[in-house]
Regions:
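Histidine-centered copper-binding motifs that mark active-site loops
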Residues: 26-272, 279, 285, 320-337, ...
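A generic structural signal for residues embedded in beta-strands
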Residues: 88, 127, 279, 291-293, ...
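Active-site-adjacent structural elements in folded domains
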Residues: 212-216, 261-265, 365-371, 415-418
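C-terminal substrate/ligand-recognition segments
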Residues: 351-362, 367-403, 420-441
Length: 468
């Protein structure tokens, strides 16, 4: 029996795929979950974040030159308290200019970063940041105009945690790296030597491997009891649906802007780019489980991927959790009450229509830093109706909002609570509260959280006058 060249290539591809599958299985859970270093301000001392080139291994075999912060990628987790006044020193030791921001942090436009705070190579930026908001999981990242997708993909990101007296007094896991873990999810594409490959596309970057805290398919060992996971989708454009291997629901306790009023159970947990969700998992009577993020590539997808780039993930395993040893410090049931929300609408509500264009742009216009697209006043309430034909995430700086409905349907439990980032598929209505002031030279941005679309101009500028 003879083979032509095409049949030979396919046969070789099949053989390679079959040899690849058992290697994945044997290597499953072989890498321990890296926990980014914890960076806290003590006695008023400044915190330093150095943007630099680093060596990093995504697969445990090859080392690649990438970008990172303080020697790691993701960078260190910054932890602060409500009421702090934090001096933050960004030092740019990279060969190109970078601007940084902290998504979800409620601070004035003068301190939020962005184009007006571009940090040149070998220069610093040292804002003093007032922390005046409830406990929440946020994230800091590059948001350089026209370069955000590439620079975030290169490694300029990290988690940011705010604590307050409410969370301090709740019986929740809160020992960082022990029963309280940052879970930062990205998709990438690596060459044969473990070096990331990035190619911008109008549709958004999609990789074929899933990374958690910078590595593939990690495991973590925990004590028996409740485990808290702070989930962050730091991917450029990919949307995930998280599930637990034994079929149980996630106990979700917090969204982008902090604690929910009560825990909610969510069987399949969506996670859009830029979104954060805090969940609890009870490991008291479970030996091992795996969290996944959707459907992985099929056998034929892998064969096809040998001949052309594939957007399917080779594996969708996020994290394997293994319970060992004694019971943890937190073994009680979930608190029935998490946080109070006595917020009342205190102004008339104006409505805005925002359409995210099919290609790029918002309301048929691309970002122009010399143009203010919207004005409002601090403390105002607004109804934003977001529409799109191309599903994508959407983020607003300097505000918080609640999801009123999706395509006319009631808000699903996973969208309860205050947010700053939302997945838009069709029509989504938001109740927006203007929390902080911004100015003509230091405006807030609202933008597609599909970072490639944002880089092409799917963004606008918002100026919020200070409260009188």
């Amino acid at each position: 029996m003879s083979f032509n060249r095409c049949q030979t290539l396919v046969a070789a591809g099949l053989a390679l795929c079959m040899s690849y599958v058992p290697m994945n299985v044997s290597a499953e859970g072989a890498i321990a979950l890296p926990v980014p270093p914890l960076l806290e301000s003590r006695s008023g001392q400044p915190l330093f974040l150095t943007l630099q080139k680093i060596h990093w291994s995504f697969d445990g075999k090859y080392s690649a030159d990438i970008w990172g912060i303080n020697g790691s990628s993701p960078g260190p987790t910054v932890r602060v308290k409500n009421g702090d006044d934090l001096k933050l020193i960004y030092s740019n030791r990279l060969p190109e200019a970078v601007s940084m921001t902290i998504s979800g942090l409620q601070i004035p436009g003068t301190q939020i970063g962005g184009a007006a705070r571009l940090i040149s190579p070998n220069a610093d930026w040292s804002p003093v940041i007032p922390i005046r908001q409830n406990a929440a999981t946020l994230w800091y990242h590059a948001n350089t105009q026209g370069k955000m997708g590439e620079q975030v993909h290169n490694g300029l990101l990290g988690m940011w945690i705010i604590e307050d007296d409410v969370t301090k007094n709740l019986r929740l896991p809160k020992h960082y790296g022990v029963d309280d873990f940052p879970i930062i999810i990205q998709d990438k594409r690596l060459d044969n030597f473990g070096v990331p490959e990035y190619k911008a596309s109008e549709d958004g970057f999609l990789g074929d491997i899933l990374l958690v805290n910078g590595v593939q398919d990690p495991y973590v060992e925990v004590s028996r009891g409740w485990v808290r996971l702070r989930l962050l989708n730091a991917s450029n454009s990919r949307h995930y649906v998280m599930k637990i291997s034994d079929g149980r629901p996630f106990s979700m306790i917090a969204s982008d802007q902090g604690l929910l009023t009560v825990p909610v159970n969510v069987q399949a947990l969506p996670l859009a780019p830029g979104e954060r969700r805090e969940v609890l998992i009870d490991m008291a009577k479970t030996q091992e489980l795996t969290i996944t993020a959707g459907e992985s590539a099929t056998f034929m997808d892998r064969v096809k991927g040998l001949f052309e780039p594939s957007n399917s993930l080779i594996s969708t395993n996020v994290l394997t959790i293994k319970a060992t040893g004694l019971m943890s410090l937190v073994t009680d049931g979930l608190p029935t009450q998490l946080a109070e929300d006595k917020t009342q609408v205190t102004s008339s509500i104006m409505q805005r229509e925002i359409h995210l264009n099919d290609g790029f742009g918002i309301n048929n216009a691309v970002l122009d830093t010399n143009r203010v697209d919207m004005t409002s006043r601090q403390g105002n309430w607004e109804r934003w109706v977001i529409t799109t034909n191309v599903p994508q995430a959407f983020h607003i700086e300097g505000v918080r909002f609640k999801v009123l409905n999706r395509n006319g349907q009631p808000t699903p439990p996973e969208d309860y609570g205050w947010k700053d980032t939302v997945w838009v598929d069709g029509r989504t209505e938001l109740l927006v509260q203007m929390m902080q002031p911004s100015y003509n030279h230091f405006p807030f941005l609202f933008y597609s959280q599909n970072l490639e679309k944002a880089d092409l101009g799917s963004a606008g500028q918002l100026v919020v006058s200070p409260q009188e």
